[in-house]
């Protein structure tokens, strides 16, 4: 920030992280088609959001609540996706006794296919 710019954000009590959250949420809204409260002047959404915040053109409590709700929704989707993936992998994996191998190597599954090209031939570029 330039020297004279620090006065613009004095209403945030030095909490620049809250400012970033607010500007991010507002920029997201602008990207989704929300109307601007200030003239755009060819600026990108993030700059417009910061100008709206500095100009006190927004209900910051409402913007912050929207940001929190967006984060909650993302976390719920992320958690649900991980739970679904874990459930799928546990259903696909065969149950085995402790200490017992779950799968067999490629050579044990199909010896004829493993003889096609062994490891040394593969790494040397041979095989013919």
UniProtKB/Swiss-Prot annotation:
Listed Pfam families: RNA_pol_Rpb6
Annotated GO CC locations: DNA-directed RNA polymerase complex
Keyword Methyltransferase: no
Biological processes annotated in GO: DNA-templated transcription
Catalytic activity: RNA(n) + a ribonucleoside 5'-triphosphate = RNA(n+1) + diphosphate
Stated family: Belongs to the RNA polymerase subunit omega family.
InterPro entries: DNA-dir_RNA_pol_omega, Pol_omega/Rpo6/RPB6, RPB6/omega-like_sf
GO molecular function, one term: DNA-directed RNA polymerase activity
Enzyme Commission (EC) number: 2.7.7.6
SUPFAM superfamilies reported in the protein's UniProt record: RPB6/omega subunit-like (SSF63562)
Keyword Transcription in annotation: yes
Region (Disordered): 87-106
Subunit text: The RNAP catalytic core consists of 2 alpha, 1 beta, 1 beta' and 1 omega subunit. When a sigma factor is associated with the core the holoenzyme is formed, which can initiate transcription.
Top EC category: transferase
Annotated protein name in UniProt: DNA-directed RNA polymerase subunit omega
Domain of life: Bacteria
HAMAP family (UniProt xref): RNApol_bact_RpoZ
SMART domains: RNA_pol_Rpb6 (SM01409)
Described function: Promotes RNA polymerase assembly. Latches the N- and C-terminal regions of the beta' subunit thereby facilitating its interaction with the beta and alpha subunits.
Species per Swiss-Prot/TrEMBL record: Anaplasma marginale (strain St. Maries)
Keyword set, alphabetical order: DNA-directed RNA polymerase, Nucleotidyltransferase, Transcription, Transferase
